[in-house]
Amino acid sequence: MARTRSENYDGIHQGILDAACDLFASQGYMRASIADLADACKLSRGALYHYFDSKEAILFAILDEHVRQMIADVEAGIAKRTSTLDQFRAAIHAIVDLNARSPQEQRLILNDLTFLSEADQQTIKSLERRIVDLVSTLLLQLDDQGKIVKRTKKVYAMMLFGTLNFSHTWYDPKGGIGPAEFADMVVDQFLYGIAGHAAPRAVRGATKS
């Protein structure tokens, strides 16, 4: 007979993911044991297995949820804008904002993805490619100088995502530059450079002091 779900199943499920994410990021996925997970979640091992059948399943759920949320945020940001530039800026804002709120998840996706099975890795990578494709398509539409061609498209895309994906290693969203201002800096620097002339910003979240 199938086991019945508790009334707070979804809340406990999410609590496990949140606690596991913190544990994996601080202690390391490979060093964290099921016993450590149970302690962090304040659950017995048996209760933990009621929600996930393995430590790997928990890691996959964390990464899958994070990347799907990023896709949803990027698509929502793009849908609210009409011009390509505003859509591009909104997409970068969405990525920066989520990464600023989820540095642990970003750290796990960069460092621990390879601990998943090949099939699960491909699932996550396929979702990541959707984000890259969304942003790269906008970037290509903004290129009025013909710099982005088949030979250079991936290089330009990875230059941009390199800045975004590894910002958790040095960027403090609680510091002097908030996520909205940082996102604008990324867009302006990537599209116009230090010496270039930046276009007016339709998407502005930062306030001047």
Give the location of each predicted region.
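Basic, helix-initiating cap at the start of DNA-binding domains
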Residues: 1-27, 32-43, 57-60
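Hydrophobic/aromatic residues within well-ordered alpha-helical segments
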Residues: 12, 55, 66, 70, ...
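Amphipathic alpha-helical segments enriched in hydrophobic/aromatic and basic residues
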Residues: 24, 29, 33-34, 45, ...
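Short hydrophobic/aromatic patch on the recognition helix
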Residues: 41-52
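Hydrophobic alpha-helical connector segments
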Residues: 61, 75-104, 156-160, 204-208
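Amphipathic alpha-helical packing segments from all-alpha helical-bundle domains
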Residues: 68-71, 75, 119-144, 154-158, ...
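Short secondary-structure transition hinges
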Residues: 90, 100-137, 144, 169-171
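Hydrophobic/aromatic-rich alpha-helical bundle segments in the mid-to-C-terminal region
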Residues: 106-110, 121, 143-189, 197-209
